[in-house]
UniProtKB/Swiss-Prot annotation:
GO terms for molecular function: cyclosporin A binding; peptidyl-prolyl cis-trans isomerase activity. GO terms for cellular component: cytoplasm; endoplasmic reticulum; endoplasmic reticulum lumen. Glycans are attached at N140. This is Peptidyl-prolyl cis-trans isomerase B. Transmembrane segments: none annotated. It is found in: Endoplasmic reticulum lumen. Belongs to the cyclophilin-type PPIase family. PPIase B subfamily. GO terms for biological process: protein folding. CDD domains: cyclophilin_ABH_like (cd01926). Inhibited by cyclosporin A (CsA). PANTHER family: PEPTIDYL-PROLYL CIS-TRANS ISOMERASE, PEPTIDYL-PROLYL CIS-TRANS ISOMERASE D-RELATED. It catalyses: [protein]-peptidylproline (omega=180) = [protein]-peptidylproline (omega=0). It comes from Aspergillus fumigatus (strain ATCC MYA-4609 / CBS 101355 / FGSC A1100 / Af293) (Neosartorya fumigata).
Length: 209
């Protein structure tokens, strides 16, 4: 091999290496696909707090995401509008979705009273994640919670299916409301309006396993 061909070979390897590094640096962040977006307009007592926009991971957990989406729109004749956040624990989570009893003992899914855990591909790695509340294995209904800190002890027990896209400051306001017995807000924190936002799907910021 002469000097010219050796130089060309080296240059080719160098160029390919640079291209691979550039591709690694510029590729989109990994994350589950957000297939739909829903919103909650929140009031605390008579005071409007603002809007929370939630992105749902319909590719990773399609059944769970569809349940939440349909309950947010109320298209099945029942759903989240008018329900409350009945349990709020600072530096942990805010919980809602019990639109039948309002105390954490009720609620139902669009598939019947309960449905099975879909999968545990996603972990509770940060604040602002949307996950199913349950009473044990395969007891998902309509109740959900939004994390306000990482909660790794819930991994493998609760199905993560979305994230807060906008309005996390509203979540923080809910997290800090005065509470009474059972971590229930002293004044009602209500979802006064809910629905779906028609928008193009985007990537979430949660890493898939």
């Amino acid at each position: 091999m002469n000097f010219k061909s050796l130089f060309l070979s080296f240059f080719l390897v160098f160029a390919v290496g640079l291209a691979l590094v550039h591709a690694e640096e510029t590729k989109e962040p990994r994350g589950p696909k957000i297939t739909s977006k829903v919103f909650f307009d929140i009031e605390h007592g008579d005071k409007p707090l603002g809007r929370i926009v939630l992105g749902l991971y319909g590719k990773t957990v399609p059944k769970t995401a569809e349940n939440f989406r349909a309950l947010a729109t109320g298209e099945k004749g029942f759903g989240y509008e008018g329900s409350t956040f009945h349990r709020v624990i600072k530096s942990f989570m805010i919980q809602g979705g019990d639109f039948t009893r309002g105390d954490g003992t009720g609620g139902k899914s669009i598939y019947g009273e309960k449905f099975a855990d879909e999968n545990f591909k996603l972990r509770h790695t940060r604040k602002g994640l949307l996950s199913m509340a349950n009473a044990g294995k395969d007891t998902n209904g309509s109740q959900f919670f939004i994390t306000t800190v990482p909660t790794p002890w819930l991994d493998g027990r609760h199905v993560v299916f979305g994230e807060v896209l906008e309005g996390y400051e509203v979540v923080e306001q809910i997290e800090n409301v005065p509470k009474g017995p059972g971590d229930k807000p002293a004044e009602t924190v209500k979802i006064v309006k809910s629905g779906q936002i028609k928008d193009e799907s985007t990537k979430g910021s949660h890493e898939e396993l």
